[in-house]
């Protein structure tokens, strides 16, 4: 009999995983403060990593990688892309981005001039001068100059401003209380017809205890309800595809797709009929490359291969596609929710790949088979 504890009662994904484990008959749930467990389904923040792996004779597995925030916080992701040797030279799939701290945080501002040594020791150096230099250069060259400011820890469309005015973006951030990212806005996205609408793509990725990377074969497009207008920044419903914003502010929510969600099979049919291309060849190949590049760049920092406990993690990668069919990584979510119709299959995959590979069913000598729902990258 294996044992597990649940420390996050708000996760719908791990509520389903918990249900599946109990249904096997060989998993028992313990009180959340019991230290002698095999599996912890923990909370994303303040997880007690330091207390794991110290119970004699007990293998312990936890559902997060310590340090995964290097990918999952917007400012940290920008820093990773700029400083990682694996990414900084070849990363053409991440929008131009700058980390900006509100001036009320008393953060040193990095000089933009060449030849001046940057204060490397201070990890909170502000990049606003670099942003302004790029902004002014684009303005002089007559390039598209729309940018988006996003709170590093924000979610559900909160803490966001889209503007073509640098001063407006910086004033917005300086009025806030936390670090933001200013990112080049994708001004020419691929649009869905009918409706001339924006979308983004959510892909779910599972990293097991051996740092094998699995992509869930199903993905979802989160679609806008209103026609895209690059000049109207005030209408969030045509720019931001977050469910919360679409549901609350758009009178056309659900008009084109139920719940403003389109799944991969329908999207592939759309691409085939509208553009004479396939999802796999035109978009998924790029998505797989980006996912693998990101995760391999942080493996040395977060892998648990040589620690007394082991980790796995489900991640949500969010992408956009431009009109040239180039895929751009927008952000990575460390505790992603899941579309309702996908819960059963996705959560069964977590059990089969991430949990049963460490704690196999006691009545079988067979190695658990990789579910067809996941593709190993």
Swiss-Prot record:
- Coiled-coil residues are none
What domain of life does the UniProt record list for this protein's source?
A: Eukaryota
> Which Gene3D superfamilies does the entry mention?
3.40.50.11480, ATP-grasp fold, B domain
Cite the InterPro entries for this sequence.
TTL/TTLL_fam (IPR004344), Tubulin-tyrosine_ligase (IPR052492)
- List the catalytic activities from the record: C-terminal L-alpha-aminoacyl-L-glutamyl-L-glutamyl-[tubulin] + L-tyrosine + ATP = C-terminal L-alpha-aminoacyl-L-glutamyl-L-glutamyl-L-tyrosyl-[tubulin] + ADP + phosphate + H(+)
Write the record's keywords in alphabetical order, separated by commas.
ATP-binding, Ligase, Magnesium, Nucleotide-binding, Potassium
- Database matches in Pfam families: TTL (PF03133)
**What GO CC annotations are associated with the protein?**
microtubule; spindle microtubule
What region holds the TTL domain?
3-370
What GO terms describe the biological role, i.e. biological process, of this protein? microtubule cytoskeleton organization; positive regulation of mitotic cell cycle; post-translational protein modification; regulation of axon extension; regulation of metaphase plate congression
| Cofactor(s) of this protein | Mg(2+); K(+)
The GO terms this record gives for MF are:
ATP binding; tubulin-tyrosine ligase activity
What's the EC number here? 6.3.2.25
Please name every pair of cysteines joined by a disulfide bond in this record: none
Where would one find the signal peptide in this protein? none
Q: What does this protein do?
A: Catalyzes the post-translational addition of a tyrosine to the C-terminal end of detyrosinated alpha-tubulin.
UniProt similarity note? Belongs to the tubulin--tyrosine ligase family.
The record's subunit annotation is: Monomer.
User: What's this protein's name?
Assistant: Tubulin--tyrosine ligase
